[in-house]
A protein has these predicted regions:
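Core segments of cupin and vicinal oxygen chelate
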Residues: 1, 7-46
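A short local loop/turn or secondary-structure capping micro-motif enriched for an aromatic residue
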Residues: 47, 54-58, 89-93
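Vicinal oxygen chelate
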Residues: 3-11, 37-42, 51-102
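Short alpha-helix boundary/capping motifs
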Residues: 48-49, 102
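Short, isolated positions in well-ordered beta-strands
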Residues: 46-47, 82
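Short acidic, gly/pro-rich beta-turn/loop elements at beta-sheet edges
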Residues: 17-18, 49, 71, 94
Length: 102
């Protein structure tokens, strides 16, 4: 399966989890309290990290792809960062960067 990935930075993670769960339907599949939330729907992989200093912004775009074994990054013609990665790679990265998923 291949899903569009959108990564956002927000300054209020709890409010974002509530709002985006209503918008997307399901609750996040992964939450690191106070730091990170991840939703996986058939259409989108949406990750949100709490970064008060950065405020609300687009961090990067990409694709979650079951057929990919490693992470790759590139920039498009507008300078936006795009990533390609497997769900397994992302799950390991969440634990490494943000801590255990609750």
């Amino acid at each position: 399966m291949r899903r569009l990935h959108v990564a956002l930075a927000v300054d209020d993670l709890d409010a974002t989890i509530h709002d985006y769960s209503e918008r997307l339907g399901p609750e996040p599949v992964a939450v690191v309290v106070g730091k990170y939330a991840l939703w996986r729907t058939p259409e989108v992989n949406l990750s949100v990290n709490c970064d008060v200093a950065a405020g609300e912004r687009l961090r990067h775009l990409g694709f979650e792809d079951d057929a990919v074994s490693t992470k790759s990054e590139s920039r498009d013609v507008n300078g936006l960062l795009w990533e390609s990665f497997s769900p397994h790679w992302q799950d390991e990265g969440i634990n490494r960067v943000y801590g255990p998923i609750s």
